[in-house]
A protein has these predicted regions:
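Acidic carboxylate-rich catalytic motifs and surrounding loops in phosphoryl-/glycosyl-chemistry enzymes
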Residues: 80-84, 109-117, 151
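Acidic, Mg2+-coordinating phosphoryl-transfer loop and its flanking beta/alpha structural elements
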Residues: 126-165
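Structural recognition of alpha->loop->beta junctions
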Residues: 94-110, 165-170
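Short hydrophobic segments within beta-strands
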Residues: 11, 79-81, 129
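Short catalytic/ligand-binding loop motif for oxyanion handling, primarily in non-cytosolic enzymes
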Residues: 17-20, 25, 76, 85-89, ...
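Conserved Lys-Pro-Asp/Glu-containing loop-to-beta segment of HAD-superfamily phosphomonoesterases
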Residues: 7, 109-139
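Active-site neighborhood of HAD-like aspartate-dependent phosphohydrolases
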Residues: 1-50, 141
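Substrate-recognition element of Asp-dependent hydrolases with the DxDx(T/V) motif
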Residues: 53-58, 62-92, 98
Length: 171
């Protein structure tokens, strides 16, 4: 990959990994937002220290997203956040998930709370595809190009259009 080309970073939970569907199933609810904060914390407590993140299913769009990004940039990287209160363990199991579920493998896998530090590298505006609006906002404030995409709500055309728009802006 050319050093002047952007790195496309893919978030895991909500983009490649069906964290929220699996979480709702674990909690025995249709949607995680149906839980009050106490019940939500109780389910999160069950995850802490476990291999939960290694066993999650792919989203239906996972492989198509990886393929689309490789067609666009030649490669991709993972940029995901660890679970608060279980950073070391959740990081280990997210890395295991990447090794077991993604092919071809990403160039790099970064698990960190503050994603925005990767928005600009060597003067290049990098791309983040993430389901959280707050992450996209911080990414764009740091100079990166953000694409808000939620696998259980959005069509793949959201990513396709955004990548085409990025290319038009840079040409």
């Amino acid at each position: 990959m050319n050093v002047n080309e952007p790195t496309v970073f893919l978030d895991m939970d909500g983009v490649l990994v069906d964290f929220f569907g699996a979480f709702a199933k674990l909690a025995n609810v249709e949607h995680w937002k149906q839980m009050d904060s106490q019940r939500l914390q109780g389910v999160l407590d069950k995850i802490v220290g476990s291999d939960y993140f290694a066993k999650l299913p792919k989203t239906n769009a996972c492989d198509s997203i990886v393929e689309m990004v490789i067609d666009f940039a030649g490669s991709y990287s993972i940029l995901s956040s660890p679970l608060r209160g279980d950073i070391t363990n959740s990081t280990k199991h997210k890395r295991a998930w990447v090794m077991d579920n993604l092919s071809p493998q990403p160039t790099t896998t970064i698990i960190v709370r503050d994603k925005s530090q990767y928005a600009l590298l060597n003067g290049v505006q990098n791309i983040l595809i993430d389901d959280r609006g707050n992450n996209i906002h911080k990414w764009q404030e740091a100079g990166g190009y953000g694409v808000k995409y939620q696998a259980n709500k959005n069509d793949l055309s959201v990513i396709s259009r955004a990548l085409k728009a990025y290319k038009r802006e840079k040409s």
